[in-house]
Amino acid sequence: MSRLPVIVGFGGYNAAGRSSFHHGFRRMVIESMDPQARQETLAGLAVMMKLVKAEGGRYLAEDGTPLSPEDIERRYAERIFASTLVRRIEPQYLDPDAVHWHKVLELSPAEGQALTFKASPKQLPEPLPANWSIAPAEDGEVLVSIHERCEFKVDSYRALTVKSAGQLPTGFEPGELYNSRFHPRGLQMSVVAATDAIRSTGIDWKTIVDNVQPDEIAVFSGSIMSQLDDNGFGGLMQSRLKGHRVSAKQLPLGFNSMPTDFINAYVLGSVGMTGSITGACATFLYNLQKGIDVITSGQARVVIVGNSEAPILPECIEGYSAMGALATEEGLRLIEGRDDVDFRRASRPFGENCGFTLAESSQYVVLMDDELALRLGADIHGAVTDVFINADGFKKSISAPGPGNYLTVAKAVASAVQIVGLDTVRHASFVHAHGSSTPANRVTESEILDRVASAFGIDGWPVTAVKAYVGHSLATASADQLISALGTFKYGILPGIKTIDKVADDVHQQRLSISNRDMRQDKPLEVCFINSKGFGGNNASGVVLSPRIAEKMLRKRHGQAAFAAYVEKREQTRAAARAYDQRALQGDLEIIYNFGQDLIDEHAIEVSAEQVTVPGFSQPLVYKKDARFSDMLD
């Protein structure tokens, strides 16, 4: 009997805002929300973006005037809409019309003369080029003479062809929320996102730790691009060329595994299992598969799974743009048939499109096994039962889509059929497509989904694509999809792909239902298939069950009496979670960052033949019995 991995918390930040309590989802379907939910989310965004202040439970304008949620919507809604989701790259990241560049300049002295200039001796190159000579000058400087042609690199600026990205809400800076000095942006985001996920559970972290053994907590996270800004690998690689020194922090903080390490070391204080599995754009699902495996096998009882990616940098944009992968200004101009480009519609899954849109995002989910969730009264937002991963076989282009995704989608649907039945899959499931917004993706992914739907007798299969709203966050992309799916389970709304006028003519949709308007479901949706396709042949498809199905499974396994006791205990959890949400809406995000605190005294660790006792943990680590190979031994 396998343990069921249930989602008991989720949180993070992307272009839609804070993910916990479905606020990011609400932003994406803001037109379809009731006034109270809409105004609550807008007020929270206004505080995040520093448009209004929150003091003593009241919202205040810059001049101190009290504001009601209705006032905030009336006064700031349009500004919030313009400063969230995919949009033109903002100057705090870079100026897409004037990105710093080096231009090669060749200089030649006039015939019979030399090029001369003064400089400090400390500034001269070592060794001195053969065609340079120096002579003493006043004030301790030297006169440099260059006698032949030479090459210089001079500061210059030029425009990027790509000018849109999925950026965190304008004014929200994760590094301002804790002592983040020297931390790359991706690590800043991982700290605040993991905090949001932990706080969203409504259960004190120490309570969780006290109920499991020290090694029964696991964290699986990371990034695919590593940390490429000046505080990470970007600064490391550029330092010598810029004449700067490499710092002692840039190399270790640049690791792609460092989001995982920061969560263990500064947020959780965990000594449990840890890992960073990468699979291009399917990376989150790779880590989710590991989380599912360690819970179903009993190796862990609590797992934090997520990713953090901060790729809005000139180098990343140039790299993906050189591949022809990104939506360019000119490409969007040709699609729209006008000179004035709407960058908010740059990401167009399954419509007329010209490339994907890079985005930053950090998202985390908290998983528990079903027994622990019941014991602690955890609020269950869904369950994750399987992730299937397959490669593409032999390839020509390493970045082109391939056949592996047929295998993953088909296996995911077959798996769900065995759990919930064919009728539920046919009439109460939906797909969160990879939907990258490239011409190749819209054809190949839609054909895969259409053919699998045909094989299982599915008609009108609802398909959505969250990248239309928040862009493509690379490692974190399928986490954006999963958390959006939880919003659909909660509100019964499937986000429409509102950045397209219509589905492109070459999209296969005989058995699919793809809409550019939000779709409110008459009957509850019970199963979501998360699909992801990554460069290199990294294909993954996950199965997510609704909280209704998860609770039905728990009731059957543990009995009505145990479930009734759980429901009673859950009310306290929900109250604590709601209290955190209200504080967060007021700007109190309660970031967990324990630098150098509660360090474990290694000399106080007690090791015996039966167990290990670790200071600071209420339960010992008891060695598990291993009978895996007992049939092979005498």
From Swiss-Prot:
Primary enzyme class: transferase
Note: FabY is a FabB/F homolog that functions as a FabH.
Similarity annotation: Belongs to the thiolase-like superfamily. Beta-ketoacyl-ACP synthases family.
InterPro entries: Beta-ketoacyl_synthase (IPR000794), FAS_alpha_su_C (IPR047224), Ketoacyl_synth_C (IPR014031), Ketoacyl_synth_N (IPR014030), PKS_Beta-ketoAc_synthase_dom (IPR020841), Thiolase-like (IPR016039)
Domain Ketosynthase family 3 (KS3) per the UniProt entry, residue ranges: 78-546
Phenotype upon loss of function: Cells lacking this gene show an attenuated growth due to a defect in de novo fatty acid biosynthesis. Siderophore secretion and quorum-sensing signaling, particularly in the rhl and Pseudomonas quinolone signal (PQS) systems, is significantly muted in the absence of fabY. In vitro, the deletion of fabY results in an increased susceptibility to a number of antibiotics, including vancomycin and cephalosporins. The antibiotic susceptibility is influenced by changes in membrane lipid composition which lack a single secondary lauroyl group, resulting in hypoacylated lipid A.
Any one biological process term the GO annotation gives: lipid A biosynthetic process
Active site per the UniProt annotation: 281 (for beta-ketoacyl synthase activity), 434 (for beta-ketoacyl synthase activity), 472 (for beta-ketoacyl synthase activity)
Catalytic reaction(s) noted: malonyl-[ACP] + acetyl-CoA + H(+) = 3-oxobutanoyl-[ACP] + CO2 + CoA
Functional note: Involved in the initiation of the fatty acid biosynthesis. Catalyzes the condensation of acetyl coenzyme A (acetyl-CoA) with malonyl-acyl carrier protein (ACP) to make the fatty acid synthesis (FAS) primer beta-acetoacetyl-ACP. It can also use short-chain acyl-CoA as substrates, including butyryl-CoA, and hexanoyl-CoA, but does not use any of the longer chain acyl-CoA substrates.
Gene Ontology CC: cytosol; membrane
Keywords recorded for this protein, A-Z: Acyltransferase, Fatty acid biosynthesis, Fatty acid metabolism, Lipid biosynthesis, Lipid metabolism, Transferase
Protein's name in the database: Beta-ketoacyl-[acyl-carrier-protein] synthase FabY
GO MF assignments: 3-oxoacyl-[acyl-carrier-protein] synthase activity; beta-ketoacyl-acyl-carrier-protein synthase III activity
Record text on subunit structure and interactions: Homodimer.
E.C. number(s) listed in UniProt: 2.3.1.180
Species of the source: Pseudomonas aeruginosa (strain ATCC 15692 / DSM 22644 / CIP 104116 / JCM 14847 / LMG 12228 / 1C / PRS 101 / PAO1)
SUPFAM superfamilies: Thiolase-like
Pathway where it operates: Lipid metabolism; fatty acid biosynthesis
UniProt cross-references to SMART domains, sorted A to Z: PKS_KS (SM00825)
